Amino acid sequence: MTNMRKSHPLIKIINHSFIDLPAPSNISAWWNFGSLLGVCLALQIITGLFLAMHYTADTTTAFSSVTHICRDVNYGWLIRYAHANGASMFFIFLYFHIGRGIYYGSYSFMETWNMGVILIITVMATAFMGYXLPWGQMSFWGATVITNLLSAIPYIGPTLVEWIWGXFSVDKATLTRFFAFHFILPFIITALVAIHLLFLHETGSNNPSGLNSNSDKIPFHPYYTIKDILGLLLMLLTLLSLTLFSPDLLGDPDNYTPANPLNTPPHIKPEWYFLFAYAILRSIPNKLGGVLALVFSILILTLFPALHTSKQRSMTFRPLSQCLLWLLVANLIILTWIGGQPVEPPFISIGQLASISYFCIILILMPTTSLMENKLLKW
């Protein structure tokens, strides 16, 4: 009698994806983040579903419905803060996952990589729309400022912004559609993740050496399931510590003030995970130029396969490229810090320098350093 795990049409797919999947024997903890992102997505969908049961997408009651969730619903405060901080964990893992891909040359799998870029854009859109839902000051003004950027598009811009708003300003119609999209997008993300995994399993995983590992594979279960559970426990420890001890650490105090179109907060800024892109946007004095730089700061990821000039896939044995990658990480941290600062000297010039170096490192320094390393190795 054949094993049901290997013969049942549905269970067979799960078996080939998570149990009998041949995996390289040397993949490190950096390969944990994919499964952690999956867990984060599931947590966000579950907590979000429970929040949606009590939330009302109306400008007059949205803020008070969030207050009601925190005060009157059983463990509502826990669900709300787990959802808000879960989003932060999601982005931390997302950035680690992308960093891993760049370091080990995983972008060579073109379909998987481009699917990942589509995923990050979708996740960013979802998080942005979720931020507008509590209808606090930063929700309202963040939504106003970011959607208003589309007015920089020549000819159709102003009409497009009014079409997105559903009126002449961010109002009830905007909040309702943001809620609708914020609810549906995680399910679309789940479908995109399935495609991302489908493409990955066509080629198999990369590994730290960057070499072909077909001659040395081990089953995913039990080796990597146990390894992933360790990562999962560490993630839950971090998330629960954040949620239970300092739930507002990563939030903005302005969002505890109900939205008021007549009172602008002194510093309008998005959530911390968008600050690097926000700093790039603000560093260019021209509106259209800023929007293009903002878009390109994310879409630049699609160029990585074309910019790879090294004869080696991974950065494991390329110390000069490693230095540049860590320089890029430091640069992104500086951009994140600048994005949260007011637009005044010296922050303006620091932001401009950090924005220029961000694009220079990726577009010029990394490819030329790779060529230099080829020369040093006489390749």
Swiss-Prot record:
UniProt superkingdom: Eukaryota
Q: What's one GO MF term for it? A: ubiquinol-cytochrome-c reductase activity
Which Gene3D superfamilies has this protein been placed in?
A: Cytochrome Bc1 Complex, Chain C
Where is it located?
Mitochondrion inner membrane
Cofactor(s) recorded for this entry are: heme b
Q: What keywords tag this UniProt record?
A: Electron transport, Heme, Iron, Membrane, Metal-binding, Mitochondrion, Mitochondrion inner membrane, Respiratory chain, Transmembrane, Transmembrane helix, Transport, Ubiquinone
State whether keyword Transmembrane helix applies: yes
User: Where does the chain bind heme b b566?
Assistant: H97, H196
Identify its membrane topology class: Multi-pass membrane protein
This protein's assembly is summarised as: The cytochrome bc1 complex contains 11 subunits: 3 respiratory subunits (MT-CYB, CYC1 and UQCRFS1), 2 core proteins (UQCRC1 and UQCRC2) and 6 low-molecular weight proteins (UQCRH/QCR6, UQCRB/QCR7, UQCRQ/QCR8, UQCR10/QCR9, UQCR11/QCR10 and a cleavage product of UQCRFS1). This cytochrome bc1 complex then forms a dimer.
Supply any other comment. Answer: Heme 1 (or BL or b562) is low-potential and absorbs at about 562 nm, and heme 2 (or BH or b566) is high-potential and absorbs at about 566 nm.
Q: What is this protein called?
A: Cytochrome b
Give the organism the record lists.
Answer: Thrichomys apereoides (Punare)
